[in-house]
C-alpha cells in the first residue's frame, strides 16, 4: 500500500468537499456551481487518487456511488416506521369526504392545520436511513412494513446525499421519497434497449422499479435515476437541526440537509386553494420532464398529523387526488371468455394496443352479459377505453358511428369454453357460470388459489405446473396435492429433482397452516381472508362451523346474510364434505390452536402500540399474543394508548409515548402481563 503524502491527502479531502458541495448545489438548490465537464474532470482526479491510495476511500466519497460488486440477492428488512401508501381521491366529492372525516376526528382544534400540496411523482417509493449523518440503508416500500434493502443501488442516485449537509447530525434520521426516471432519460434507455435487441420498458415507473432491483449497481448508475424527498423522521434535535413542526418546515429541512425537493409545492389555507392548485397543474404537468399522476395533499401541522394517526392502510392526514385517467379509442378485434375458480365466465375484449397513462393496453374486462348489453358491444366496434384509477383497463363506451357494416351484437356463450357443459345465469346474478364441478378451468383456478401466498402458501407451485397437474389428471382436487411425491412430479415436463423435492417439502409444510388460512384456501364464494379470520374466531373448529345454519353465521359482526348463506351451502354440499374429510386425513389444520373461548382475557380493554425490534418475538407474534389475550394493537400512539411495547431502535412512537406519560413495556414485561 502506497504511503500517502500530506499534499495528496489534503487534495483528496478538498476534492471530496468540493464535489459534495457541487452535488448539493446542483440537486438540492438547482443552482449549479460548475459546468458538467469541470465536475467530471475533478471527479476523475479523485478516482485516480483513491485508486493510488485505497486507504483514503471513505463510504461517503462521491466515487462510492458506483462500482460496488453486484449483489446476489436482496434482503428483506423491517421498516423502522411503516411506509404507508396513500388513499386516493378522484373528484372534489372524494376530497370533501376526506376533509369532513378528519375534521370529525379532531373536533376541538384551536386553529386549522392548513394544507401542503405537492405533485405526486410517478415512480418508486424509497426509505433512506442515515446514522450520524451517513447513508447506511436504502429500502423499497415492499408491503409497507418490510421492504428490500437496495443500498448499493440507492448510492448510485446522484440526488441522494451520501452524507447529510449538516455539521451536527442526529443519531438517526429517515427520509422517504420517490425515485423516478425523467422522460428524456427513459426515452434514451428504451432506444438503447432496442439497439441491444431487448424489450422496451412500458413506462418510466416500471423502468424505475426494475432498475432499483438490478443486482448490478453499475447498471443502476447508468440509468440515471433521480429522487425527490418528501418526508423526514428524526431521532431528536441537534445543535443545528430543529425538529420541524409543519410539513412545510419538513420540506425546507430536507433541502437544508442536501435533498432535492420538488419545487412545485404550495401551502394552502382551504380546500378551495387546493382545488386551484390541482386545476393549475392539470395541464401544466404535461410539460414537466417527468410523469406525475396527481396531487398529494397533507395537513401542514405535524401535531395534528400525529393525533390523527393511521388506518390499517393509509395515513388519515394525507390523500392523493388523482388526475382523470387518460382515454383512447381503439377497435375490438375479438372477445375471449375466461373461466374463474367459482365458475364465473368473464368476457374480455381484445383490441388493438393503445397507450393509456403511460402503459400499453390491449385487453379489458367486459364484466358480464348485462354490461355487454348496456354497451351494445359488437365485434369490430371502435370503443373508448380508459384506466380506472389508472390501474385497471375498462371499456367506457362504444362509438357506434364507426361500427362496420354487418357487425353482429356479441352474445355470451351458452356453453362453458373450458369443459363444454351448459353455462347458466341465475335470476339473482348478472354473472354467467359454469356449474360443472369437474370443469378443468374451475379446478385450475381453485388450485392456484389454494397454493397462493395468502392461503396455504405452497412455494414452487406456479400456474404452469398447476396446469400440467390438471391437464395430466394427476391432480383433480386440492386433496390430491397431498398424495404427490417426487416420483410423480418427475413425470411432468421440465421437472428436475431439486424442484420436485422443493414442492413436496412445501406441500408438507402447508399442513401446519392455521385453520383460518385453510378456510380461506377452500375458495368459498365471498369468503376472503378477513372473513375467514372472523369465522374461525367464532367457530374454532370445522365441525362447529359445519353444525350451524346460515342465520346463526350471519349474527357474526362483519358477516352479512349473503356470505353466511354461501358458507352454509358450501358445507352442506356432499362433495365438499368429502373434500374436508380427505384434507383432515392428510393432516391439515381444521381447529384453531388457541380459541378465544379458552384463552384468558387478561388484557381485555387495553390498547397497545409496538415499536422497535423485540429481542425474541416477531412483531406479528407479539400482536397475536396480545389479541389472543383480549387486547387491541394499534399503529399509532394517542392518549388512549395503555402501553407501548418498546424494542431496539424504537422510533418516534416512543418519543410521543414519553411526552404523553404512557407506560412502557419491554418484551419481558409484556410476557409477564400475559401470564
From Swiss-Prot:
InterPro entries: BRCT_dom (IPR001357), BRCT_dom_sf (IPR036420), DisA/LigA_HHH (IPR041663), DNA_ligase (IPR001679), DNA_ligase_AS (IPR018239), DNA_ligase_CS (IPR033136), DNAligase_adenylation (IPR013839), DNAligase_N (IPR013840). Keywords: DNA damage, DNA repair, DNA replication, Ligase, Magnesium, Manganese, Metal-binding, NAD, Zinc. NAD(+) binds at residues 36-40, 85-86, 118, 141, 178, 298, 322. It catalyses: NAD(+) + (deoxyribonucleotide)n-3'-hydroxyl + 5'-phospho-(deoxyribonucleotide)m = (deoxyribonucleotide)n+m + AMP + beta-nicotinamide D-nucleotide. Residues 598-675 form the BRCT domain. Signal peptide: none annotated. Gene3D superfamilies: 5' to 3' exonuclease, C-terminal subdomain (1.10.150.20), 6.20.10.30, BRCT domain (3.40.50.10190), DNA ligase/mRNA capping enzyme (3.30.470.30), Helix hairpin bin (1.10.287.610), Nucleic acid-binding proteins (2.40.50.140). One of its GO terms (molecular function) is metal ion binding. Zn(2+) binds at residues 416, 419, 434, 439. The keyword Ribosomal protein does not apply. One of its GO terms (cellular component) is cytosol. Its EC number is 6.5.1.2. Pfam families: BRCT (PF00533), DNA_ligase_aden (PF01653), DNA_ligase_OB (PF03120), DNA_ligase_ZBD (PF03119), HHH_2 (PF12826), HHH_5 (PF14520), Nlig-Ia (PF22745). The active site is at 120 (n6-amp-lysine intermediate). Its cofactor is Mg(2+); Mn(2+). GO terms for biological process: DNA repair; DNA replication. DNA ligase that catalyzes the formation of phosphodiester linkages between 5'-phosphoryl and 3'-hydroxyl groups in double-stranded DNA using NAD as a coenzyme and as the energy source for the reaction. It is essential for DNA replication and repair of damaged DNA. HAMAP family: DNA_ligase_A (MF_01588). Belongs to the NAD-dependent DNA ligase family. LigA subfamily. PANTHER family: CHROMOSOME TRANSMISSION FIDELITY FACTOR 18, DNA LIGASE. This is DNA ligase. It comes from Acaryochloris marina (strain MBIC 11017). The lineage of its organism: Bacteria, Bacillati, Cyanobacteriota, Cyanophyceae, Acaryochloridales. The gene is ligA.
